[in-house]
Amino acid sequence: MDTSRIFPIAAEPYAFDLKPAQCALLIIDMQRDFLEPGGFGEMLGNDVSQLRRTIEPNRLLLAAWRMQGLAVIHTREGHRPDLADLPPAKKIRGRSATCIGDAGPMGRILVRGEEGHDIIPELYPLATEPVIDKPGKGAFWATDLHGILQNKGITQLVVTGVTTEVCVNTTVREANDRGYDCFVPSDCVGSYFPEFQEMGLKMIKAQGGIFGWVGHSSSLRAVLV
């Protein structure tokens, strides 16, 4: 693959011009507590199969991306063990019997260093791939993601992960405000709620692509050869 070329990728609202040398794969919050049976997501009554369907498309895209030596960055949502970075408003949000920092099936919920906070084995980062530990929904707020991307000369992002309407959408909007072009493969992002999945993707591509482009991972993989 000639990474200096521009590759038109089928997308909505119109084709996305992929520039591989300037594009990073940003995988959002594919964490055990969100995706695995018995984790925090399931404890809240959610159907984790809605998220688990994204694992295989992400695995295939990640393998193809790595094969070309392109930039990969992962994120995890979570907090310091002392919870000093956890706003009270976030702690009580949802009014669940179990809150962030409480004991869960895979350690303390959304606390850095705990089993449930870590990324699922199927997509586990290589030692050379930065992992952004973020305390909020967006991957740019209170992190060094923007600086890392600038240092790598990145101007485009392929954004995958969970959940579509929360952390993926928030990150895409943050990226858009910072001048990054974002492509979201619909099969590589997921929501516990099908209606939120649909609307989350519609919002990204609305009004001529106000926040970015929406397509399918197969279109990306077709050029990663």
Question: Where does each model-flagged region fall?
Answer:
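N-terminal nucleotide-binding beta1-loop-alpha1 segment
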Residues: 28-29
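Short glycine-enriched, charge-decorated loop/helix-capping segments at active-site entrances
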Residues: 40-50
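Short catalytic/ligand-binding loop motif for oxyanion handling, primarily in non-cytosolic enzymes
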Residues: 80-84
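A short, glycine/acidic-enriched catalytic loop
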Residues: 37
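Glycine-rich, aromatic-flanked loop segments that form ligand/cofactor-binding clefts
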Residues: 25, 74-76
